[in-house]
Amino acid sequence: MTAGAVLVMGAGSVGCYVGGCLAAAGVPVTLVGRPRVLDAIAQQGLTLSAIDAAAHSVPASALRLAGAVPVDAAPALVLLCVKSSATAEAAAELAAALPPGTLVLSLQNGISNAAAASAAAPSLKVLPAMVPYNIAELAPGAFHRGTVGRLAAQDDALLLPWLPVFERAGVPLDLRAGLVAIQWGKLLLNLNNPVNALSGLPLRDELLQRGYRRCLAALIDEAMAALDAAGIAPAQLAAVPARRLPTVLRLPTWLFRMVAARMLRIDAKARSSMADDLALGRRTEIDAFCGEVVRLAQANGLTAPRNAKMVALLDVWPAQPQRLGADQLCRLLAL
């Protein structure tokens, strides 16, 4: 038995992967997204693959595709998967089309999206969640999960009927009493997104270059200082505790390979979503990553100049399409 129909608001990499897995498990799924993505799915369906699972296909006939929230939509659950900059607009569209009290799960990057969605759509029940894994669009209609992990969401009784559904679909969901620490733990790891995007390399190749790791370590150092000042203890989501991450990242590569073997359980296809954004000339979510660190630092009387520099670099990227080598990026961050 399914808990009901699902509407994915924002059919990008996360939305298509999670929504596609649910559809493959028999859940009625509507994907709301842009023509670039939906046209490819309409023509050839979805192809879903993962580092730890065989690839499988979801025919277009198993999905409902829409450019906007259908007027007759009445989902039991909405997965909000739009980019951070589109959160308020998407939430308002949902509120205008869906019954009051509709359950919305924010599967978005950053810290503040669920609050922003709630403010824009107070009639809806919005809960924050965290996506631990990397999903890349390998080709039109083809989405690949390149790392492992389990979804986490704010604990709420309304989500209990969905736990077996997500488990059966191969995208297991855990409920957590306090999600802020988990969200910050994920954001620390996501600080690698801009480094990876500017490198132009697959994730694993980038992490095996010490210069890029030094850049990431410097960004995490600033974030940890801000978190300490704010009294926030980030959850450990990697094999290494958050506070030790910068030290491990700065190790020589031969030693890093040994110490961080679990961290390197990334297949050759994996890359950051921000790299996909740059490749398509789209505005990135840098404000939800490094921008969040800058704001937390400022709110606690600190500065985060290297995170601010990353925001500046990514904000002008369409005008500067060159990739940055590790030494170049280190110089730009004054390392």
Where are these predicted regions, by residue range?
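Conserved hydrophobic helix-helix packing surfaces used for dimerization/oligomerization
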Residues: 5-6, 78, 104, 151
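Short beta-strand/turn micro-motifs composed of small residues
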Residues: 10, 33, 82, 108, ...
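NAD(P)+-binding Rossmann beta1-loop-alpha1 motif at the extreme N-terminus of oxidoreductases
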Residues: 1-54
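Rossmann-fold dinucleotide-binding core
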Residues: 109, 113-201
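A structural micro-motif
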Residues: 4, 27, 102, 124-125, ...
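NAD(P)-dependent Rossmann-like dehydrogenase/reductase catalytic/cofactor-binding core
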Residues: 221-335
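Active-site lid/adjacent beta-loop-alpha segment flanking the redox-cofactor pocket in flavoenzymes
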Residues: 200-215
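Rossmann-like NAD(P)(H) cofactor-binding subdomain of soluble oxidoreductases
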Residues: 58-142
